[in-house]
Regions:
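Compositionally biased, low-complexity intrinsically disordered regions
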Residues: 2-4
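N-terminal low-complexity, intrinsically disordered segments
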Residues: 6-94, 98, 102-107
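Polar/charged low-complexity regulatory segments
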Residues: 11, 26-28, 32-34, 42, ...
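Residue-level detector of alpha-helical secondary structure
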Residues: 82, 132-135, 168, 172-179, ...
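Amphipathic protein-protein interaction modules
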Residues: 86-166, 170-173
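Metal- and O2-centered redox machinery and metal/ROS homeostasis
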Residues: 206
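Extended, Lys/Arg-enriched charged tracts that mediate electrostatic binding to polyanionic substrates
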Residues: 209
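Non-Sec secretion/translocation targeting segments of pathogen effectors
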Residues: 216-218
């Protein structure tokens, strides 16, 4: 179920150069998934909680969506992923180098915008929901909904190349659809007027850049 796969916070404007600013938006935190795993005493290795995060990060590395600061610090990891992904376990990298979190500052401007569209709001399309859909197809409805998984079936998906390639195709389709929205790059971040309006409304707001097709918000 959707609520079992999510740890999201509302979008907040990032001021200044997205790659130089220390402010960042949280996307996912493994502690949430590990907490569920431990509370339900699931018989799996806690490293499985990083699986879906590692898939997303690898795809972004392979598609040049990482930010300048990240490349300066971890460029060798990106090169390893591109050269020999099968022998580069990004789960341990996320655990040891990223403290179990994915956050917007890891990515360049396009990567941030796509993450906000696909990983930052509980609306379709939504990356955690796509992971959950894969679990449903992989295990089948009967087993997926059984007490065996206790609503955490995604944690039991084998972390192998088939899993990555299947999800990579899904992410690719989402990315192509997103690019097809024809965003005005000058509006990827809220303008001063947009920020003022959101502050005036004094409620949780979702900012959308100027786009040719309003399908994502319909």
């Amino acid at each position: 179920p959707e609520e079992q796969m999510t740890l999201k916070i509302g979008y907040e404007p990032i001021k200044g150069d997205p790659e130089d600013d220390d402010d960042s938006i949280g996307m996912d935190d493994v502690s949430y998934h590990i907490e569920n795993l431990e509370e339900k005493e699931l018989p799996i290795d806690p490293i499985n909680a990083y699986n879906h995060m590692a898939i997303y990060l690898r795809w972004c590395m392979e598609h040049d969506l990482m930010g300048g600061k990240f490349l300066a610090e971890h460029g060798e990891v990106v090169n390893q992923v591109k050269a020999d992904p099968g022998n580069t376990d990004l789960r341990t990298f996320i655990r040891e180098e990223l403290f179990g979190c994915l956050f917007s500052a890891l990515f360049n401007q396009k990567g941030r915008a796509f993450a906000h569209y696909y990983y930052g709001e509980i609306d379709a399309p939504y990356y955690p929901a796509d992971i959950d859909d894969y679990a449903l197809k992989y295990f089948g409805p009967s087993r997926y909904h059984s007490n065996e998984f206790q609503q955490e079936a995604y944690l039991f998906i084998p972390f192998d190349e088939k899993y990555y390639q299947t999800m990579a195709q899904v992410i690719e389709e989402r990315f192509e659809n997103w690019q097809g929205q024809d965003f005005d790059e000058d509006t990827l971040e809220p303008s001063e007027v947009a920020q003022a309006i959101m502050e005036y409304l004094d409620c949780e707001c979702t900012y959308f850049p100027s786009m040719a097709d309003d399908d994502p918000i319909m």
